[in-house]
Design a protein with these regions (language model features):
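Membrane-embedded, lumen/periplasm-facing catalytic core of multi-pass transferases
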Residues: 161-185
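Catalytic beta-strand/loop cores that center a nucleophilic Ser/Cys/Thr
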Residues: 402-454, 469, 523
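Membrane-embedded transmembrane-helix bundle of lipid-linked glycan/lipid transferases
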Residues: 1-159, 171, 250, 279-282, ...
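Extracytoplasmic/lumenal acceptor-recognition loop(s) of multi-pass membrane glycoenzymes
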Residues: 142-145, 150-154, 176-249, 257, ...
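A glycine-rich, often tryptophan-bearing local segment used as a flexible ligand/cofactor-contacting loop or short
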Residues: 355-414
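Catalytic cores of secreted or luminal carbohydrate-active enzymes
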Residues: 244, 259-260, 268-271, 285-288, ...
Length: 583
């Protein structure tokens, strides 16, 4: 079996190094698990439609029969199918997301494999009595009824063209296609499924889109997830600003979700206007915004602050003026790269060399750059297995239902209770701060959670306040977080829309720009190469002034070919040895 995998090396190496398996995004992964009752209940299929995966009640019956009454040869497939079914549940997600390689385990995508294993074992079950075979076959056939309309249609005497045109008009997609010059963001939480993506990009007057069917596999999937999350939290300034970063001159929003998330249309409208988007059209369900741009354009941006680490996106959503970067490793950045920012946030960062990382933070702080460190995300020391950085040690603590009152330099804070599902809160407080700006009492002890170390430009905070704020939008905690950095949640990065000329050729993209450091709004991929200087930030490709020719080639070709060649050689050797042993 190992040799078989090696034979696939030319494909496998590229797949494991890039693409969907390189993504580390729990929000994307969570979309591929669901309630077991939905998975096996045919009535849920009839009432909810086709937005959920359906395993089949009949398939479950076949599994039970096979496990209980099948013999060894056929039972294996039934057991395998049952295990895969259990692994698709929300409960399994809570475990699988913590495992190494969890980015491979989007379990609902394995349902088809499970069904094939079950059917194969059913066919191999040659000892099963014919009446039972007939009964199970009839049950399997009947179980297709909830999904029958996918094959035969609705039988409502309306042609596909009429139905699609009506759907385009009712959702304002046709209006959006008319005004869109470069790209459209359809923000409806994919309620239309793949149909919505098809109506935008392949029907009528098709235009490019930011969202799409199978967007989980996109290189910009984290950007898309953050847009949806910010919209749910009411962070409309972030939404429109990042739509601009992604090259969306049109944004089409389903208004139902404003009410669902207790957000207001007035706040949405105000944020759109701040970024230059104007309302073009609206109906009872959708509202369309558009900003005037050249036909093909990019963005030159300037951020006052940068966030590094797995928690960078949460900071950026609270403070849109904060840039997120691709690597969480602090050792990947130089002093010169970070010294141009006023603030550097570290949240869930890593390092290869602790001493070098600490030295970088100290140099930045002495140069006047404020470094805000969220202590919950400080890496564990490899020798002591403790969370320690710059002489400050993180000590674990658990709260239940809510934080205690917090005494801070902006006054006493009385935070909201923990939200449902997070009533047990594991976090850290701090030992070793030079100046203490925040304390709380627990079990009669006065404990520190907020202050400075080494100098006033290095600020540390514990208690996982950023994550708490992302869940609750607690006003007092938001004020404290803003006070730490001096950045307002209303502040935006400086952006300038600039014209670009983009031409697509045979396995190449030619980009002509009149400016340096231009975000092309095109997703960056590891198949890109160029003799010119191209870079990538926040999953997007940047070019400089002049003409840049980007070549597209098969990634990791030689490494993959080497693995495949080794697989062929080892397979031949194994076959020769096996043949000699048989003789």
């Amino acid at each position: 079996m190992i040799f078989g995998f090696m034979l696939l090396g030319i494909w496998l190496v590229a797949s494991l190094r890039g693409g969907i398996t390189s993504l580390d995004n729990s929000e994307n992964m969570a979309n591929f698990f669901q309630n077991l009752w939905i998975t096996i209940n045919p009535f849920e299929r009839l009432t909810r439609g086709f937005e959920y995966f359906y395993f089949g009640f009949a398939a479950l019956v076949v599994i039970v029969f096979g496990i209980l009454f099948g013999y060894k040869k056929s039972r294996t497939g039934f057991v395998t199918g049952f295990i895969i079914l259990l692994m698709t549940t929300k409960s399994a997600y809570a475990v699988l997301k913590h495992l190494p390689g969890s980015q491979y385990l989007w379990m609902l995508r394995f349902i088809s494999i499970a069904l094939c294993m079950i059917l194969m074992s059913f066919l191999m079950w040659d000892r099963l009595k014919k009446p039972l075979v007939l009964m199970l076959c009839v049950l399997l056939a009947v179980d297709t009824i909830p999904s029958l309309s996918l094959i035969v249609g609705e039988h409502n005497d309306i042609s596909v063209q009429e139905r699609m045109a009506a759907r385009q008009d009712s959702t304002l997609i046709s209006n959006a296609q008319t005004v869109t010059k470069q790209r459209l963001a359809l923000m409806d939480e994919s309620i239309l499924g793949a149909t919505g993506s098809w109506l935008v990009s392949d029907y009528g007057n098709p235009v490019d889109a930011t969202f799409g069917a199978g967007r989980e596999a996109a290189n910009t999937s984290t950007n898309i997830v953050n847009l949806n999350k910010a919209f749910a939290q009411g962070g409309f300034l972030y939404v429109f600003d990042r739509c601009l970063e992604l090259g969306d001159d049109s944004v089409l929003i389903k208004k139902t979700f404003l009410k669902q998330y207790n957000n207001s249309l007035e706040d949405l409208e105000a944020a759109a206007n701040v970024l230059g988007y104007k309302r073009v059209e609206q109906n009872s369900d959708y509202i369309l915004y558009h900003i005037e741009t050249p036909d093909s354009w990019g963005v030159v941006s300037s951020y006052r602050a940068v966030a590094i680490g797995s928690g960078a996106a949460a900071i950026s959503m609270q403070f849109p003026a904060v840039e997120t970067v691709d690597s969480a490793n602090l050792n990947d950045y130089t002093y010169e790269e970070l010294a141009g920012y006023k603030e550097v946030f570290l949240n869930g960062f890593t390092y290869d060399d602790k001493e070098t990382a600490e030295d970088l933070v100290l140099r930045l702080s002495r140069a006047g750059v404020k470094v805000i460190i969220y202590a919950d995300g400080i890496p564990q020391d490899k020798r002591t297995h403790s969370q320690n950085f710059l002489g400050v040690t993180c000590s674990s603590i658990t709260f239940h239902n809510g934080y205690p009152d917090m005494d801070t330099r902006i006054g006493t804070i009385y935070p909201d209770m923990f939200p449902q599902g997070h009533t047990t809160w594991n976090t850290v407080y701090l030992d070793g701060l030079d100046t203490v700006w925040g304390t709380f009492y627990d079990n009669g002890l006065n404990l520190d959670f907020y202050g400075t170390v080494k100098n006033d430009n290095i600020i540390m905070t514990g208690l996982n306040l950023t994550y708490f704020y992302s869940l609750t939008d607690d006003v007092s905690v938001g004020q404290l977080l803003s006070n730490m950095s001096g950045i307002s949640s209303e502040e935006l990065p400086d952006r300038k829309i600039v014209p670009l000329k983009v031409e697509y050729g045979n396995n190449e993209i030619t980009i002509t720009s009149n400016n340096d450091n231009v975000n092309t709004t095109l997703a960056y991929h590891d198949i890109f190469s160029s003799s010119s200087d191209i870079t990538h930030r926040n999953n997007l490709m940047y070019v400089n002034k002049g003409t840049t020719v980007v070549k597209m080639s098969y990634p990791y070709l030689w490494r993959g070919a080497l693995v495949s060649t080794a697989g062929v050689v080892l397979m031949v050797v194994w076959l020769i040895v096996k043949r000699r042993n048989n003789n």
